Every structure is written in structure tokens, then in C-alpha cells.
């Protein structure tokens, strides 16, 4: 664990040319930074003050803005100074060098760690901040902001408090066993409360991994035989030339990926090798990988050549597959073509036929994967899911017919798992894993 007694500093903005660079200082001695830069002004809390910054040789470095956030009403809960200087590399280097004479450079995530230790955020909120920083689409950002606002923490803490309340009643029966026989009605209420919690947590787990999918990206695979236009469609959806498009069979051998945004949802799009029998060991490996990726995908776009539409034979129909007639250069509209009870969408990338409709269908399919009550917080990380699963295992062992000490222990262990998610129960390796993934200035 990091030493939180030292005063730390770091650049909070990207190093390089910019209009403004922000340097954050946090700790008991943060105000000494202003003395070091020969700033003799009275700092009014949370007000921007224009300052001239001088180095150790009394040479002017820059004129900028300083803002003082006194503890505990700051981001970290400690005294914080934020310096805003011109975003040139030389200015930033000199300011950081001067600060290193009196303070310690912050480690990755150290500002947030201090905020967590000072009760400014719980772990789920900090993970929400990380997700907001990493968000590439509108829907990812919306989910991160909800988590950052503390919705998950409120849910998990309410469950934990209910378990603690039940456990306290059980503990009372341990201390006063003569009351157990006369309180059968109360014991039934306890059992009902635990079973209600089990149901609530199980419903929370039965979410089809929506939160994790939104955070990580939905996997869509383009599949089909060789030379049906998979790479052309891949490049079209990716809006750039990634895959090599060729008339030669077997050009695409390994899996190509592109991260795209469709309707605000993050998509990991994969182009795969054409499915066929091949004696070429390299192509065969590519085909094997293509089949595996197709099985693992959340959605598939399966291509069939338009000119062979009367010979199509689909043995398995899947609601997770969009069926496309590719290279449909001769069609006059994008109306679906029904073949063997399957609606095929004719698409011609060359003539722009069916492309808008295909994107619309993809968006509809993607949205179906994320249909849920927007007011209910969702699991966003495997860490949360693991703890919830462990908690529910302990609660399923709960049985009022067991020795009352074992009943109490099951409740304690379940409450502990809920506490691990929010950080009330301190697990050092979990903290290290979360905070080390942040940049230095966070």
C-alpha cells in the first residue's frame, strides 16, 4: 500500500502542447508549493488566483492560476493545490522539476486512493471514474456516470445493512438462547428476509452480462464462405481500409478486429477467414479460429452470395444472426428477400444498396442485448459478479435448522463479500489492482 503521509504531485493533463496544463498537489503540506514558487498572495479557498511562478533561482517560469482546496472539502480529502500553467513542454518540465525538490511524484491512481481512504468515494465509484475515462461511446459514458454517482454502492450497501441487521438478531439469540423457543415467529421473519435477499441478488446476477458487455464491447463477427464480400463489409462498417480486399480466395486468414460505435454502443467487429475445406495448414488454422470466434460472438453477420441465393441451405436459424445477401449489385431496393423462411437482407457496398438498413438492423439487434430497467444498477465488472456469487452461495447455505452459530457465520460471510465490492472490507490486492490501472495524474 502507498504511503499517504507524504505530499504528492503530478501532471493531471496530457504532457505535450496544449493551451493549459493542470498540475495537482495533495497532502498536508500542499500550500508549501506556493511558497516554493515565491507566491505571497492570500489564497481564498476554491477561488482562482492569478500568480507568477518563480524557480529556485528566482527566474520567472510562467504566470498562471492557482486554486486552493482545503481539507476535507477537496477531491482527495486533503489540502489540494491545482496549478494551471501554459501547456508547453518546457514550462511543464520546469514546474515538475521544482515540485520534485520538495514533494514526491504521485504513483498511478494515488490521488484517487487517497480520496477512497478519506471516504470521498467507494470502490465502485472509483471504477466508474476509470470507466468514464476509458469510455469511447455515449452509452459507455452514461453507464460510467451512473456508477460514478454511487448507484451500485447504494444497492450493495443496502443489502449489506439488511444482512447485518438479520445477523444482529441471530447474535442476540446466541447470547440469550432461552428466547429462541419463544420467538418462532421472529425466526420465520428472519428466514423470509434472507430468502428475499437471495432472490434480489440472483435477479441482479441474471442480467445477461449487460453492464460488462457495454463496458467491454459487444462482439460481432462477419462470417461466410470465401469471396462473399466479408472484408469489403468489414471495411465499410469500420469506415476505413483495414482488411485487404482481393478476388483471390483465402486472402483473409487471421482474425481482424475493429472497434466501432453503432448507435452509441461499443462494438468489437471481427473479419474472419472464409469457411471452406482447405489442405493449406495456415488457412485451415484461420478457418478453425473463424469458427471458434463465430461461436463465441454475441452477434453474427452471415454472408451469402446474391447470385447463389436459390442454392442457399441454412440448417440452423439463429436470432443472433443477421443474414445478408452480399454483392447484390442487381437489386433495385433493400427489401428483404425470404428464402427458406429466413429474411435475407440484400446488400451492395458498391452501389450503396441496403447499407443503411443493415446498420439499422445491427443497431436494433445490439439494443436488444441491452434492454433492461434503466433505473436498476447493473454489474459492470467480473470482480462484482464474483463477490455476488460468493455471497449468494453463503446465503443458500443459510438454514434456521442448522446450529445458530453456523447460521450467523453464513450471514457474516455473505455481508463480507458485499463489503469487498464497495471497499468497506479492505482487501489490499484488490485495491492495488484497481488503483494501479489509473494514470499518474489521477
Curated annotation (Swiss-Prot):
One MF annotation (Gene Ontology) recorded for this entry: metal ion binding
Main location: cytoplasm
GO cellular component: cytoplasm
Domain TrmE-type G stretches: 217-367
InterPro entries: G_TrmE (IPR031168), GTP-bd (IPR006073), GTP-bd_TrmE_N (IPR018948), GTPase_MnmE (IPR004520), MnmE_dom2 (IPR027368), MnmE_helical (IPR025867), P-loop_NTPase (IPR027417), Small_GTP-bd (IPR005225)
GO annotation, biological process: tRNA methylation; tRNA wobble uridine modification
Pfam family, one: MMR_HSR1
Entry cofactors: K(+)
Its EC number(s): 3.6.-.-
Highest taxon, organism lineage: Bacteria
CDD domains, per the entry: trmE, TrmE_N
Subcellular localization: Cytoplasm
Binding annotation for GTP: 227-232, 246-252, 271-274
Alphabetical UniProt keywords: Cytoplasm, GTP-binding, Hydrolase, Magnesium, Metal-binding, Nucleotide-binding, Potassium, tRNA processing
Cofactor binding, per record: Binds 1 potassium ion per subunit.
Positions contributing to (6S)-5-formyl-5,6,7,8-tetrahydrofolate binding: 24, 82, 120, 442
Family: Belongs to the TRAFAC class TrmE-Era-EngA-EngB-Septin-like GTPase superfamily. TrmE GTPase family.
Subunit structure of this chain's protein: Homodimer. Heterotetramer of two MnmE and two MnmG subunits.
HAMAP family in alphabetical order: GTPase_MnmE
Function: Exhibits a very high intrinsic GTPase hydrolysis rate. Involved in the addition of a carboxymethylaminomethyl (cmnm) group at the wobble position (U34) of certain tRNAs, forming tRNA-cmnm(5)s(2)U34.
Name of this protein: tRNA modification GTPase MnmE
Source organism per UniProt: Wolbachia sp. subsp. Brugia malayi (strain TRS)
Amino acid at each position: 500500500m502507498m504511503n499517504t503521509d507524504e505530499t504528492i504531485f503530478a501532471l493531471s493533463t496530457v504532457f505535450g502542447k496544449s493551451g493549459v496544463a493542470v498540475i495537482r498537489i495533495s497532502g498536508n503540506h500542499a500550500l508549501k508549493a506556493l511558497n516554493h514558487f515565491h507566491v505571497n498572495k492570500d489564497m481564498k479557498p476554491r477561488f482562482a488566483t492569478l500568480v507568477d511562478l518563480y524557480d529556485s533561482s528566482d527566474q520567472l517560469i510562467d504566470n498562471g492560476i492557482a486554486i486552493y482546496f482545503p481539507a476535507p472539502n477537496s477531491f482527495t480529502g486533503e489540502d489540494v493545490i491545482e496549478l494551471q500553467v501554459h501547456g508547453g513542454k518546457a514550462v511543464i518540465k520546469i514546474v515538475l522539476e521544482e515540485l520534485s525538490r520538495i514533494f514526491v511524484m504521485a504513483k498511478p491512481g494515488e490521488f484517487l486512493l487517497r480520496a477512497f481512504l478519506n471516504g470521498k468515494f467507494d470502490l465502485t465509484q472509483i471504477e466508474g471514474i476509470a470507466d468514464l475515462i476509458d469510455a469511447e461511446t455515449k452509452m459507455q459514458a452514461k453507464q460510467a456516470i451512473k456508477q460514478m454517482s454511487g448507484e451500485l454502492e447504494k444497492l450493495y450497501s443496502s443489502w449489506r445493512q439488511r444482512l447485518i441487521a438479520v445477523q444482529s438478531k441471530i447474535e442476540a439469540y446466541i447470547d440469550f438462547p432461552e428466547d429462541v423457543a419463544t420467538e418462532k415467529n421472529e425466526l420465520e421473519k428472519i428466514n423470509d428476509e434472507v430468502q428475499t435477499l437471495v432472490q434480489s441478488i440472483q435477479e441482479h446476477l441474471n442480467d445477461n452480462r449487460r453492464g460488462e458487455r457495454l463496458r467491454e464491447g459487444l462482439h460481432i463477427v462477419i462470417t461466410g464462405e470465401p469471396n462473399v464480400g466479408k472484408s469489403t463489409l468489414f471495411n465499410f462498417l469500420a469506415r476505413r481500409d483495414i482488411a485487404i480486399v482481393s478476388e483471390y480466395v483465402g486472402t483473409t486468414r487471421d482474425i481482424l478486429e475493429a472497434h466501432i460505435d453503432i448507435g452509441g454502443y461499443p462494438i468489437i467487429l471481427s473479419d474472419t477467414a472464409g469457411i471452406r475445406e482447405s489442405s493449406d495448414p495456415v488457412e485451415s488454422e484461420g478457418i478453425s479460429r473463424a469458427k471458434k470466434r463465430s461461436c463465441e460472438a454475441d452477434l453474427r453477420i452471415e454472408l451469402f452470395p446474391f447470385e447463389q441465393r436459390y442454392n442457399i441451405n441454412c440448417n440452423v436459424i439463429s436470432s443472433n444472426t443477421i443474414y445478408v445477401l452480399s454483392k447484390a449489385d442487381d437489386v433495385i431496393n433493400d427489401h428483404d428477400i425470404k428464402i427458406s423462411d429466413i429474411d435475407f437482407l440484400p446488400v451492395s457496398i458498391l452501389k450503396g444498396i441496403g447499407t443503411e438498413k443493415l446498420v439499422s438492423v445491427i443497431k436494433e439487434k445490439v439494443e436488444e442485448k441491452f434492454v433492461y430497467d434503466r433505473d436498476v444498477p447493473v454489474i459492470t465488472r467480473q470482480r462484482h459478479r464474483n463477490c455476488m456469487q460468493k455471497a449468494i452461495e453463503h446465503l443458500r447455505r443459510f438454514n434456521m435448522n442448522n446450529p445458530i452459530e453456523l447460521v450467523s457465520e453464513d450471514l457474516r460471510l455473505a455481508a463480507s463479500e458485499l463489503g469487498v465490492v464497495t471497499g468497506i472490507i479492505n482487501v489490499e490486492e484488490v485495491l492495488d489492482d484497481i488503483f494501479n490501472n489509473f494514470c499518474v495524474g489521477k
